[in-house]
Regions:
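Active-site loop/oxyanion-hole signature of alpha/beta-hydrolase fold enzymes
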Residues: 104-156, 163, 168-169, 330
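Catalytic active-site module of serine/aspartate enzymes centered on a nucleophile-bearing elbow/loop
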Residues: 306-352
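Flexible "cap/lid" loop of the alpha/beta hydrolase fold
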Residues: 163, 167-214
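Conserved HGGG/HGGXW glycine-rich cap/lid loop of the alpha/beta-hydrolase fold
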Residues: 59, 64-118
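Short beta-strand/loop motif that positions the catalytic acidic residue
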Residues: 277-278, 284-286, 290
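Active-site glycine-rich loops that stabilize anionic/oxyanionic intermediates
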Residues: 80-84, 152-153, 182
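Hydrophobic alpha-helical topogenic segments used for membrane insertion/localization
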Residues: 2-30
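Conserved alpha/beta-hydrolase catalytic His-Asp/Glu region
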Residues: 212-276
Length: 352
């Protein structure tokens, strides 16, 4: 089929997809008036001290840090697909209040997301994201124990790092949080199944052969993928402020980023790295109403990690850290405690 033919098919399908977005808007508009997050400063993370880390292929990653470099433990947060570091706002607030100077936090925008640089299509892979995470850890927390917490694509990034840098899990990383994620691709379930249609295929073809056209037609292009992600974000009715923030992060993500990462999300498989992750305390958490990565994927992941804590969040959608922050924050507290304990045990073993 010619490019124009594929684009014709794409345009003909937008009415149906737009109606899905309309359902999301109606649900948001019907939320209760008592605003839980009225006055919440969701830009607080963006005012933290900033640095830039260059990846091995020259992409600048924007990194922000909270806490003293002398803190006994650092937590590195890795966000998911079509999000940015602000997706961790409620966890940043909680960890700062709960742990104070005992825990330092590092946040960054993944390549092609937020304020970080735009990569080429061929480097939009989970493997490359793993190398990026390794670079952030090396430059921003060069010594001391580290807990890594990844959501969605950020969890996949963390598992990729285990494949590439098992030495970090033997020496530095003392805990791993895997939220709403999977070790293998999405082509069989969740988001992958939703993306198996000729509309998405047409748009992928256009992104490969005519990226200028795709970027110019970004309004039309967003109607392909974003309604699926919006509908899957929450399993329950949430605060309008949270819905607005997640919408804004999605809307500000480049169309090319949205498309260029689809292939790797569907096909990646880092299952061979799970024994490395199994050597440190781990948390596996997912909502059982997640339509992007189903809870069954988290069950399978936890079964492969000896001693993993599996947390099932009843009614939770894909943005579970926004939707059920109390449950997520409590689970993170337990992971941090286990990370501290693992570090103490490792030091004692080294002395013996």
């Amino acid at each position: 089929m010619t490019l124009m033919g594929r684009m014709g098919l794409l345009g003909a399908s937008l009415v149906t997809l737009a109606s899905s977005a309309g359902l999301y808007a109606v649900r948001s508009a019907g939320m209760p008036a008592n605003e839980m997050y009225r006055g919440e400063d969701f830009d607080a993370l963006l005012r933290l001290p900033q640095r830039t880390v260059l990846t091995d292929d020259g992409i600048p990653l924007v990194v922000r840090e909270s806490g003293s470099s002398r803190a006994p433990l650092t937590v590195v947060f890795v966000h998911g697909y079509c999000l940015r570091m602000q997706s961790w706002h409620l966890q940043y607030r909680h960890v700062r209040e709960r742990w104070g100077e005992d825990v330092r936090m590092v946040f960054y925008d993944q390549r092609g997301h937020g304020e970080s640089g735009m990569p080429g299509r061929n480097s939009c892979t989970i493997a490359q994201l793993g190398r990026d995470l390794g670079r952030v850890i090396d430059e921003c927390t060069p010594d001391g124990p580290v807990v890594v917490i990844g959501h969605s694509m950020g969890g996949m990034t963390t598992i990729a790092l285990a494949s590439q840098r098992p030495d970090l899990f033997e020496s530095r990383i003392v805990g791993v949080g895997l939220l709403a994620t999977t070790a293998a691709g999405l082509n069989k379930s969740g988001l992958g199944r939703n993306l198996e249609n000729p509309v998405i295929d047409a748009f992928r073809y256009a992104a490969r052969t005519a990226p200028g056209f795709v970027q110019a037609a970004r309004g039309m292009a967003r109607a392909v993928v974003t309604p699926i992600l919006r509908a899957a974000s929450y399993g329950t009715v949430v605060s309008p402020r949270l819905a607005e923030l997640s919408d804004r992060m999605l809307d500000e993500t480049s169309v090319l980023t949205i498309v260029n990462f689809l292939r790797t999300l569907e096909l990646h498989d880092e299952s061979a790295a799970l024994p490395v992750l199994g050597s440190v305390p781990s948390l596996v958490l997912c909502g059982d109403a997640d339509m992007v990565i189903p809870f069954s994927s988290s069950e399978a992941l936890a079964e492969s990690l000896p001693g993993a804590e599996l947390e099932r969040v009843r009614g939770g959608g894909h943005l579970v850290q926004f939707e059920f922050p109390e449950i997520v924050n409590s689970a993170i507290d337990r992971l941090i405690q286990r990370g501290f304990a693992h570090e103490v045990s490792a030091r004692r073993a080294a002395i013996v």
